[in-house]
Amino acid sequence: MYKRQLLHRAFAPHDPALRVSAFGVHFPGPLGLAAGFDKDAACAEGIAALGFGHVEVGTITAHGQPGNPRPRLFRLVRERAVINRMGFNNEGAHAAARRLRKPRSVPVVVGVNIGKTKVVPESEATADYVASARLLAPLADYLVVNVSSPNTPGLRNLQAVSLLRPLLTAVKQVADATPRRTPLLVKIAPDLADEDVDAVAELALELGLDGIIATNTTIRHGGETGGLSGRPLKERSLEVLRRLRAKTGDRLTLVSAGGVEDVDDVWERILAGATLVQGYTGWIYGGPLWAARIHRQLLRRVHRHGLKSVTEAVGRTA
């Protein structure tokens, strides 16, 4: 515990100019860790101590599951990318809830990303998500409905508005009923057609969601089966962000993920309308203190542009 506190003091963002407020939650810095690393909510404090402004745990399913057979994770070093077909391997919502109830030794904003249990048929998906939400929404700083992983059969079908509306409506009822109303976001794929991106944005506004995370991994590649993350995703992720900003303005919190490697990427996403930015593959290649380094550089960028806060830069080029 003491070591975590020392690390947090040394590397976590502390400058007021980096603070961000989104959907009623206060973040010490805009750059967080995307879901996929801390699948069981086991080490969020340690991750935050390395310089992240928030940690999104999961993806967590209602029932524990082993995920797909190994090998299921592949580095593409030359492309600064990763292909994964993990398949939501996790111990389940009950195990995650036990960990999330424990007191934290350092302050950390924890988002909880939930997905569909693999063996649950599509017709029962809503009930499956609701089961996770009931356990985890009261323990989360924000909740994310993941309908965009390519590694659970049929999951991406749930991005169709006709299926997504009842799913999000049901989960939102659970999130809204928590003592402090847990903010709810949806995470979408980069492979959606532009008109489908627009449709999800309109649905999010209609239902009163708090935000959209864009984007998950892509299946548009020629390598191993699975979702591709990292540098090759950069261009499309930025396109989707700009489209969402044009569609929603500042009515939704936009969280940009996909191809984020350095401070220039983070700054570009903020200028394009992202209030928060997430990375994972960039951290793999950038080393343990990747987020701390970017936050330091981002602070210098804010000062160089004569801004009092990073929030003043959100959407400046949108």
Regions found by a protein language model. Give the residues of each.
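A gly/proline- and charged-residue-enriched helix-loop-helix capping module
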Residues: 58-108
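Catalytic cores of alpha/beta
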Residues: 40-49, 192-206, 246-250, 260-277
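Glycine-rich phosphate-binding active-site loops on the catalytic face of alpha/beta enzymes
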Residues: 51-65, 147-149, 211-221, 266-293
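C-terminal helical cap(s) of enzyme catalytic domains, especially alpha/beta-barrels
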Residues: 64-80, 221-230, 284-308
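Short beta-strand/loop segments at the ligand-binding rim of alpha/beta enzyme cores
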Residues: 24-32, 106-112, 176-192, 244-256
